[in-house]
Amino acid sequence: MKKLAIMAAASMVFAVSSAHAGFTPSGTTGTTKLTVTEECQVRVGDLTVAKTRGQLTDAAPIGPVTVQALGCNARQVALKADTDNFEQGKFFLISDNNRDKLYVNIRPMDNSAWTTDNGVFYKNDVGSWGGTIGIYVDGQQTNTPPGNYTLTLTGGYWAK
């Protein structure tokens, strides 16, 4: 009986003391965010340029695009065109109205060997790479309607 009384008293003390405890916010809230990425990081630069229609002759350069690939030791660096920028084996810039196309070729400017496969332009050798690819007019396109044209390339790696 004495033991039961002690247990009851201990329960009362615990209940009383825990009833008054609680969290009161009085500061700021911090957030922890984590993005998990592939080891092979391929960053593709931006290019903005203006050309007259008369400059859109076959093989005329549109401009250089920088590519920086890190951590790609056993991977082949690759660039993938959006579905709006590739059809029937050809890359193109698409107009803002999504009707007009300006066909282009993509070539590395360091003479390294690359291959195109279904909208993916990839380096034949594995390993990290930093350099520049050139975007060139494919065919005579001096009749291209004026407007804004876009080619979107996403960096990644090629896996066979």
Curated annotation (Swiss-Prot):
Its main location: other. Keywords: Fimbrium, Plasmid, Signal. The keyword NAD does not apply. Changing A59T: In strain: AL847. Disulfide bonds: none annotated. Pfam families: Adhesin_Dr, Dr_adhesin. It comes from the Bacteria. One of its GO terms (cellular component) is pilus. Residues 1-21 form the signal peptide. InterPro entries: Adhesin_Dr, Adhesin_Dr_signal_peptide, Adhesion_dom_sf, Dr_adhesin_sf. Residues 22-75 are annotated as: Receptor-binding. It is found in: Fimbrium. The keyword Secreted does not apply. Hemagglutinins of uropathogenic E.coli mediate adherence to the upper urinary tract. These adhesins bind to the Dr blood group antigen and also agglutinate human erythrocytes in the presence of D-mannose (mannose-resistant hemagglutination (MRHA)). Belongs to the Dr-adhesin family. This is Afimbrial adhesin AFA-III. It comes from Escherichia coli.
